[in-house]
Regions:
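Transmembrane beta-strand segments of Gram-negative outer membrane beta-barrel proteins
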Residues: 55-70, 97-105
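Outer-membrane beta-barrel transmembrane domain signature
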Residues: 84-92, 107-203, 212-215
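Surface-exposed strand-loop-strand hairpins of Gram-negative outer-membrane beta-barrel proteins
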Residues: 68-79, 114-116
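Short loop/turn motifs that connect adjacent beta-strands in outer-membrane beta-barrel proteins
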Residues: 28-33, 46-61, 86-97, 133-141, ...
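Short hydrophobic/aromatic beta-strand or adjacent loop that forms the aromatic wall/cage
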Residues: 74-78, 125, 206-208
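Hydrophobic beta-strand residues in large extracellular and virion-surface proteins
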Residues: 64-66, 79, 99-101, 130, ...
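N-terminal periplasmic/intermembrane-space "pro-region" immediately following the signal or transit peptide
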Residues: 37-45, 61-70, 92
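Cleavable N-terminal export/targeting peptides
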Residues: 1-55
């Protein structure tokens, strides 16, 4: 189980390295946020792989989320669902921060009111999110990063030509939740592209609010 996790994390790290090398490909990207998402994911997956023997047993923890996002042309609404958390043992936590990996499935609907492409599409994403949590008083402050794989129902929407239905999704978010982690609200940035597998490769940069509820 731990060896499988290490292989998955190393593969995701290699994808993150590829993504970092493509940071100047598209003018519409937000370089600081995209670079932070990819570099943060790369370092986090690498750290997790190195510390694979220091994880506690994964525990059931069902959460559902809704996220709204938009860029200069497109808008999206996403529903997310995760069923478990895999946390590092307290002695191995980086700088005293809780380090938690939550495999998450996300279903999204995109829409556009301009351009020659489709007016809407559906996206399905799988991403192992890494969350750094700092409990402080009655609140929990966090930073979340992750790189995952996405499948689009169409390869173009609005004026964005994606060329492939298969895409990569990298994200970074900042949030706050109550002490019991029952309800969380945060900001999320998400970039979707195919890493230059095929061109044109018009990236999409969604920024918006996320609301997460523990079921």
């Amino acid at each position: 189980m731990k060896d499988t996790m290490k292989k998955i994390l190393l593969r995701l790290t290699s994808f993150a390295v590829m993504g970092l090398s493509m940071t100047q490909v598209h003018a519409e990207e937000v370089p600081f946020l995209k670079n932070s998402a990819i570099l943060g994911s790369l370092l986090s997956y690498g750290f997790a792989a190195i510390n694979k023997d220091n994880f506690q047993a994964c525990t059931p923890n069902r959460k559902a989320s809704i996220q709204t996002g938009s860029d200069e042309e497109l808008s999206s609404v996403s529903l997310g669902f995760s069923v478990s958390d895999c946390a590092l043992k307290p002695a191995a936590q980086p700088m005293g921060l809780q380090f938690v990996i939550s495999p998450t499935v996300i279903a999204s609907g995109w829409s556009s009111n301009s351009g020659p492409g489709a007016r809407s599409l559906t996206e399905l994403t799988l991403v192992p999110k890494v969350q750094y949590v700092l409990p402080y008083g009655s609140l929990r402050w966090d930073v979340t990063v992750g790189v995952g794989i996405s499948l689009l129902s169409k390869s173009s929407v609005g004026s964005r030509i994606k060329s492939t239905n298969f895409q990569f999704s990298d994200e970074i978010g900042f949030g706050v939740s109550d002490a019991a982690d029952k309800l969380r609200i945060g900001f999320t940035y998400r970039h979707i592209s195919n890493l230059g597998i095929s061109v044109p490769n018009n990236g999409v940069d969604f920024r918006g609010l996320t609301l997460t509820y523990k079921l």
